[in-house]
C-alpha cells in the first residue's frame, strides 16, 4: 500500500492537532467541578464518564496523522492507568502542555535533543521533591479521604476504607452490580468460588434455593466421576460417620449423579456435588488451595491416587458449606494454620515474579480467598448508564487508594506539582537544556489552571497566587477557598502524580524529537454500482 510521508514542522503540526483534539475532550473532566463526556456505544445506552483513560481509548480521528498524535497521548493515559490506576486526566493535561510548549521552541529553532535532556532533568528533580514532600497514609480516615476525592463521593470513600480495613492493603476487593439503587459493602466470609450445585435436587433450603451442609466432609479431585462404584468405598465411610459430603470434581455426571440425587431424595445421605473452579493449571492450584484450607488432599492420578482408595482421612473438613446455583462458599476450613501461611507465602512469591496482569489478578484473588473474607462492593444506581459511570469511578478510587498506601500522599488539586516548582526552577542549565526545564515548569502549572477553569474561574490568577503560598496550601475548587490541602483531606496519591508526570514527559520528549511521520494513503472510494433501473424483467416470462 502507498504511504503518505510528512516531515519536520508539517509532521509535528498535524500530530499536534490530534493531541489537542483528544486532550481538550479529556481535560474538561478534571477537578471537583469537571464535566462529563458522553461516549456513543454501538449496542446499549451511551456511556457517560469523567474517566480520562476511558475517553482517550474511544477517540479515533479520520486524518491518519492527527490520529497518531491522539494515540500518543492516549498512550500516556493508558500507561498511567496501568501503573497507578488513576491520574489519567492529569497525565493527559501535562502531556499536552509539554508538547505545545516544546513545539513553540522547536519552531523557534531550539534543538529537540537539548530540550529532551532538559525535560528529563526537570522531571527527575520534580520526582525527587515529590518523594520528599509525600506523607505516609495512616488510619482509616486517610484512606477514606483518598478514595472520596477520587470517586467524588464521601460514602464510597467510607466503603473502600472499611473494605481495606478488613482485608489489608493488598487484599482483593471485588466490584459487582447491585440489583438495588444503593451502593453497599458485603463481606463474603470463608472461601468462595464460582461453581454451583450439579443438580437442583441437592438443595436443602427450597426458599433460598441453596444447599447448606454443617460440618461436612469434602472430597476434592480433578477427575470426572461418572461411575458410582469409583466413590462407593468413601461414600460408605462418610455415611457411617453420619456427616454430609461435598464433592468437588471436574464433573459429576451420568449414573453417578443420578445415584447421588436418588439417595439424597430418599434421605439416605446428604451430599452435594459441584464442578471444580478454574481451568487447566489454575484449576489444579485452586483445588490445592481448597485442600490446604480444609485439611484434605487432592485425589489425582498425578500423585498416584485414585478415588477407590480414598478414605475419610484424605477428605477435607469445614464448619459449614453453602452452595447456591452459582457459588460455593466454604466457611471455617480445618486446615493447619502453618500450611495455610506457607501457601499464602508461596502465592505472594508468585505475585512478585509474574509480569502478566491477568495472572496477577487471579493470584490476588486466590490470596484473598485463603486469607478468608472477600469484601464485595455492590454498586447500585437508578439507570444502567449511571451504574456504568459509578462503577468506573469506584474502580478508579480503589486503584487510587492502593497507590496511596504504596507511596504515600501529597497535596491534591494539582498543588503538589506547584510545590515542586521552586526545586525544578533552581536547576542550573544553559541553552536548549534550560529551555527544556522551562517547558516542564510551564506544564506543572497546567493541572491547577485547568481545575480552576473547569470551576469557572480565571486559571492564571489562581496559578500566580499559588506560587506565593506555603507548601501544602492550595485552592479548593469545590468551595472556592484557599486551605491546607492535607488537613482538609484534599489529597492525591504520590504514585499517581509521579506516574502522570513521568509518562507525560516521556511521550512529550518522543514527540518533539520526531522528524518524519509515515501513514497509509487513504484508499480511493470503490466505484458505485451501475444503475439497474433500466433492466426490464419481461424477457424472463418463459421461466415461469
From Swiss-Prot:
Disulfide bond sites: none
Any single GO BP term: chaperone cofactor-dependent protein refolding
Lineage: Bacteria, Bacillati, Bacillota, Bacilli, Bacillales
A single GO molecular function term of this UniProt record: ATP-dependent protein folding chaperone
Positions contributing to ATP binding: 29-32, 86-90, 413, 476-478, 492
Subcellular location: Cytoplasm
Subunit description: Forms a cylinder of 14 subunits composed of two heptameric rings stacked back-to-back. Interacts with the co-chaperonin GroES.
Catalytic activity reported: ATP + H2O + a folded polypeptide = ADP + phosphate + an unfolded polypeptide
Gene3D superfamilies associated with the record: GroEL (3.50.7.10), GroEL-like equatorial domain (1.10.560.10), TCP-1-like chaperonin intermediate domain (3.30.260.10)
Family: Belongs to the chaperonin (HSP60) family.
The protein's role, per its UniProt record: Together with its co-chaperonin GroES, plays an essential role in assisting protein folding. The GroEL-GroES system forms a nano-cage that allows encapsulation of the non-native substrate proteins and provides a physical environment optimized to promote and accelerate protein folding.
Species assigned in the record: Bacillus cereus (strain ATCC 14579 / DSM 31 / CCUG 7414 / JCM 2152 / NBRC 15305 / NCIMB 9373 / NCTC 2599 / NRRL B-3711)
Keyword terms, alphabetized: ATP-binding, Chaperone, Cytoplasm, Isomerase, Nucleotide-binding
HAMAP family registered for this protein in UniProt: CH60
Keyword Transit peptide: no
EC number: 5.6.1.7
One Gene Ontology cellular component annotation held by this UniProt entry: GroEL-GroES complex
UniProt protein name: Chaperonin GroEL
Amino acid at each position: 500500500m502507498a504511504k503518505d510521508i510528512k516531515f519536520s514542522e508539517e509532521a509535528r503540526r498535524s500530530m499536534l492537532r490530534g493531541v489537542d483534539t483528544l486532550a481538550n475532550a479529556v481535560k474538561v473532566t478534571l477537578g471537583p467541578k469537571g464535566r462529563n463526556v458522553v461516549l456513543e456505544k454501538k449496542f446499549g445506552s451511551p456511556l457517560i464518564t469523567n474517566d480520562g483513560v476511558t475517553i482517550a481509548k474511544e477517540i479515533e480521528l479520520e486524518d491518519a496523522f492527527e490520529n497518531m498524535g491522539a494515540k500518543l497521548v492516549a498512550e500516556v493515559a493508558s500507561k498511567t492507568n496501568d501503573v497507578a490506576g488513576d491520574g489519567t486526566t492529569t497525565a493527559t493535561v501535562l502531556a499536552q502542555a509539554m508538547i505545545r510548549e516544546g513545539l513553540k521552541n522547536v519552531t523557534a529553532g531550539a534543538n529537540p535533543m537539548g530540550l529532551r535532556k532538559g525535560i528529563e532533568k526537570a522531571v527527575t528533580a520534580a520526582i525527587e521533591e515529590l518523594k520528599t514532600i509525600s506523607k505516609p497514609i495512616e488510619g482509616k480516615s486517610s484512606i477514606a479521604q483518598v478514595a472520596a476525592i477520587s470517586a467524588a463521593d464521601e460514602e464510597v470513600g467510607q466503603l473502600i476504607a472499611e473494605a481495606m480495613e478488613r482485608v489489608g492493603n493488598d487484599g482483593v476487593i471485588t466490584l459487582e452490580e447491585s440489583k438495588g439503587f444503593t451502593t453497599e459493602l458485603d463481606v463474603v466470609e470463608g472461601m468462595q468460588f464460582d461453581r454451583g450445585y450439579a443438580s437442583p435436587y441437592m438443595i436443602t433450603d427450597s426458599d433460598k434455593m441453596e444447599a447448606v451442609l454443617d460440618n461436612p466432609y469434602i472430597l476434592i479431585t480433578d477427575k470426572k466421576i461418572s461411575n458410582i462404584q469409583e466413590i462407593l468405598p468413601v461414600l460408605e465411610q462418610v455415611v457411617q460417620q453420619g456427616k454430609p459430603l461435598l464433592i468437588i470434581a471436574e464433573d459429576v455426571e451420568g449414573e453417578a449423579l443420578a445415584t447421588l440425587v436418588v439417595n439424597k431424595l430418599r434421605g439416605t445421605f446428604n451430599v452435594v456435588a459441584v464442578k471444580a473452579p478454574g481451568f487447566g493449571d489454575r484449576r489444579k492450584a485452586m483445588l490445592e488451595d481448597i485442600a490446604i484450607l480444609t485439611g484434605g488432599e487432592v485425589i489425582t492420578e498425578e500423585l498416584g491416587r485414585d478415588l477407590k482408595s480414598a478414605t475419610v482421612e484424605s477428605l477435607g473438613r469445614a464448619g459449614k458449606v453453602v452452595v447456591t446455583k452459582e457459588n460455593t462458599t466454604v466457611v471455617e476450613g480445618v486446615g493447619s494454620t502453618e500450611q495455610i501461611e506457607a501457601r499464602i507465602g508461596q502465592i505472594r512469591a508468585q505475585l512478585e515474579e509474574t509480569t502478566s496482569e491477568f495472572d496477577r489478578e487471579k493470584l490476588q484473588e486466590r490470596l484473598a480467598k485463603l486469607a478468608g473474607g472477600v469484601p464485595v462492593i455492590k454498586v447500585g444506581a437508578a439507570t444502567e448508564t449511571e451504574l456504568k459511570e459509578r462503577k468506573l469511578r469506584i474502580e478508579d478510587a480503589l486503584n487510587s487508594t492502593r497507590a496511596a498506601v504504596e507511596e504515600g500522599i501529597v497535596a491534591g488539586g494539582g498543588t503538589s506539582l506547584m510545590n515542586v516548582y521552586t526545586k525544578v526552577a533552581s536547576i542550573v542549565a544553559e541553552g536548549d537544556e534550560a529551555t527544556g526545564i522551562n517547558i516542564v515548569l510551564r506544564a506543572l502549572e497546567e493541572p491547577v489552571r485547568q481545575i480552576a477553569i473547569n470551576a469557572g474561574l480565571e486559571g492564571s490568577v489562581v496559578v500566580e497566587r499559588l506560587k506565593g503560598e506555603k507548601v501544602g496550601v492550595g485552592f479548593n475548587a469545590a468551595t472556592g477557598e484557599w486551605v491546607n490541602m492535607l488537613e482538609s483531606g484534599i489529597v492525591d496519591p504520590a504514585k499517581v502524580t509521579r506516574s502522570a508526570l513521568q509518562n507525560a514527559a516521556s511521550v512529550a520528549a518522543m514527540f518533539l524529537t520526531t522528524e518524519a511521520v509515515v501513514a497509509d494513503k487513504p484508499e480511493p472510494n470503490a466505484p458505485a454500482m451501475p444503475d439497474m433501473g433500466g433492466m426490464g424483467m419481461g424477457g424472463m416470462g418463459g421461466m415461469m
